[in-house]
Amino acid sequence: MKKVYSFLLYILGLTTFAQNSNNEQFPLFHDCEGLVGKQQESCFYNTIQNYFYTNYKIPQELQNQQYKGTVIVLFEVDTVGNFKVLYADAAHELLKKEAIRVFESLPKVAPATYSGKATYSKFTIKINIPLVAPNSIDGNESTKYAKTNTLLIDNKKELSEYDNIQYKPFENPQFKSTGIVQFSHQNYGVFDALLNQVGSNNHTASKPYSYDEVAKYYDLETANQSFLKKKDSWWGRKLWNENVVAIQGEEYWFTLNPILDFRVGKDTESQASNTFVNTRGIIVNGGLGKQLTFTTSIYESQGRFADYYNAYAESIRPSGGNPAIIPGIGIAKRFKEDAYDFPLAEANIKYQPNKFINLQLGYGRNFLGDGYRSLLQSDAASPYPYFKINTTFWKIKYTNTYMWLKDVRDAVTIDGTYTTKYMASHYLSMNVTKRWNLGFFENVVWTNTNERGFDFNFVNPLIFYRTVEFGSSSKTGNALLGLTSKYKWNNQINFYGQFLIDEFAISDVKESNQSWRNKFAYQIGAKYYDAFKVKNLLLQVEYNQVRPYVYSHSNPITNYGHNNQSMGHLWGANFREFVAIARYYRGRYFADAKLIYGQRGFDFNDGTNNFNYGGNIYLDYDENRPYDNG
């Protein structure tokens, strides 16, 4: 792991740069001319404080009450040097009006400049009531203490740094940031049509998207404004319109919101009274400058599902005694007698040094494809740690993802510790024409055989993984190749598909004997936006077929899985599936309808028929295989 950290630091080091603050200048009053740097800043604030002390008139009725308090004013200096109050806050309206009057009477100044050009500048000032005469401090306090150790700390003195922190009105900066838009098919369906217009030069297969990618085609901020309700109370505004906590300052912002979700249902074939999911959580989003964004969310849930779902969750339970793994979430503990307690955490830190490259360090899931399912890399498994590099230029987007996965079976658990395995993939997406997109996918899974660890042979994003795999021993790695394609018939209809090769033997293809060694999968689908001229109605059909033994390996630990779940299609292998979906939304309301029909090949495991028919990706495909052909 030390090598991994060194590599990440090296990548980040390549993108750092220094900024020169000497090209910035504060607004200048006439008396401040000739000063430079911090002297300009001090003179600017001192002049305003002096002006307020001289000209601010406290209303007589407040003087009679011996009122004590503060007035906070957010103001700007425009490009010609005029002062303008943006926001004033005080306990009494008279105090705010007087502050605005004083600002309007301030003399015109030389505007702030950046790189020699006049620019707008914003400031915040705090005025104490009653007024206090500005004190001029001779010399720098820190210099005094540095020169001698005979000065005692003044317990009555307070620094003003905390009080001088400047805040701005929250302007929803996340909608224009490089932050991640949380992925779900329902959420992305709102703007999917606009991203898939003929002639667009984007890449929709690699998900999740960032806000700035979506904002080119869909105005997220305007859409958010259209959802707002007329609410005046604090509770009403926070419930319907605003973030519970939202802070924006100079070059930074962050939000914090609680998550509450309660669902109840009924399984008619179950003896349980009902099904339910009760979720509480918190989500934090933020940005530091324009290049660094972050998001993290923590969920705590209890739930009881339909009997068939409970049975599946328990069938993939981990080593160690926990009763189940909730698909797409993680390991669950027992809750009461027939329910589960399952936490979930996801996080992403994204650094974008320029418009071509972004680096992401996260704990979550990724998705490759334009369909409802993905055969290459889906979001069906539990979250995992990953490092991702996106490179976008010309007509190309190149995505490299390095993942740390877990095998939680009894057979590979040592001293209560689950086995770690590694996965590296790269996906090259190219817009061949204004209608046709073509993508190439390579992936390899390997383990810590012979203390191999994270093999840096796979870090090079341009290398052909299959060649490296055999150079490192084909028995300790598992490689897959894939192809994706999308064709935009017009702005309403597009067709998409995927083809995955796990293993392929040309000799068996020529014999047409349906050899088990020809392990491949494919997907075809179509989307119809604003179907039948109904605004915001999306219709989608999709067919998926995965042959037996796809995603599996002779050494099960190097299969295409994580936490006893498939990293590809969630059904694993040996199946056919047809999906039909209708989605409709209007304002805050949405409706989804899905029809899923499938045929799957299962193992019997009844003591007599214990063959491996190729559906369970956690079985060795060289053992108990009933047929080689057919």
Question: For each predicted feature, which ranges?
Answer:
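A mature extracytoplasmic/lumenal domain signature
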Residues: 75, 87-90, 125, 131, ...
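Outer-membrane beta-barrel channel domains
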Residues: 156-437, 443-448, 511-520, 527, ...
